[in-house]
């Protein structure tokens, strides 16, 4: 759970 998730990157800057 984190940047590894494409959906998470959608609204999270890594």
From Swiss-Prot:
S-S pairs: 3-14
Location relative to the cell: Secreted
Keyword tags: Disulfide bond, Hormone, Secreted
Protein name as it appears in the record: Somatostatin-1
Family: Belongs to the somatostatin family.
Keyword Secreted: yes
One Gene Ontology MF term: hormone activity
Domain of life according to the entry: Eukaryota
Keyword match Signal: no
GO cellular component: extracellular region
Protein function: Somatostatin inhibits the release of somatotropin.
Chief place where the protein resides: secreted
């Amino acid at each position: 759970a984190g940047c590894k998730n494409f959906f998470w990157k959608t609204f999270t800057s890594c």
